[in-house]
């Protein structure tokens, strides 16, 4: 199959609302267009199922390297997803019921031979906070619970704890409770919806002052540089969405050890684009839904991470 004949669909948040300067999906689309791919644009609610086949309202998409005008969309048509070669599922979390339904619909296209990145089974299995817990040797002490007594006992044991929801992104809903335990009851009540929802508590890692580092794996292979996301003053969240700044750095020996721990399972699940979040010596999250930070690393290091991903896609489709 020649590159020029490849039809790539993307399911994403509204393209009009993306951050032109740092959007990873846009970088992927530029790279695909430059290789001669035909681009097809979809939002999550464009997907539908009829008589056991997955369809979507698709619009032809052209992307531009122009901060004032970065895309053009053609006329919408309803077409089977099976007409596409590959679909990039780039809808940002939260992983709510609608996200899960969309992934199930993409699974019907997968069964008809469409390559979905990342694979639908892996998207359904790999909660970004919980997936990392399959590698306890790589993680800081952690508990997942909805019960007030379990969460309080964990705080009493560790003294300095981060509480966070299991389905957030960009640093939303994260609380740091110090040894004095101020507001712990209110935080647990708010995050667990009074005991109705599981949340994560993790021992606070002082290394966050140096930022957390995003490490990208493309088809199981690490990009040689990570992005340290350094919190703004007084923040405990390094996420760029929470005001952190991104500084690219080479991977450390410990980073490579962490990667080696997770690589076999990432390859086994067919995950083609994954972001590890590392604080100090520990993995805190394994992002599989819509990993970012490509633009910042490419800009600072001259890498072509989208090109690496497209090479991997072409190998799968060959």
What are these regions, as identified by a protein language model?
Residues 3-6, 12, 17-21, 233-234, ...:
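ATP-dependent carboxylate activation and anion-phosphoryl transfer catalytic cores
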Residues 5, 16-144:
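Conserved N-proximal alpha/beta basic substrate-recognition cap immediately N-terminal to
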Residues 10, 88-89, 202:
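Redox-cofactor binding/interface segments in oxidoreductases and associated redox assembly factors
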Residues 33, 110, 155-156, 267:
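Anion (oxyanion) recognition and catalysis
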Residues 40, 116-117, 162, 200-202:
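Structural detector of well-ordered beta-strand residues that form the stable sheet scaffold
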Residues 120-123, 229-231, 279-282:
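Short glycine-enriched loops at secondary-structure junctions
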Residues 149, 156-160, 167-256:
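Phosphate-binding site of ATP-dependent enzymes
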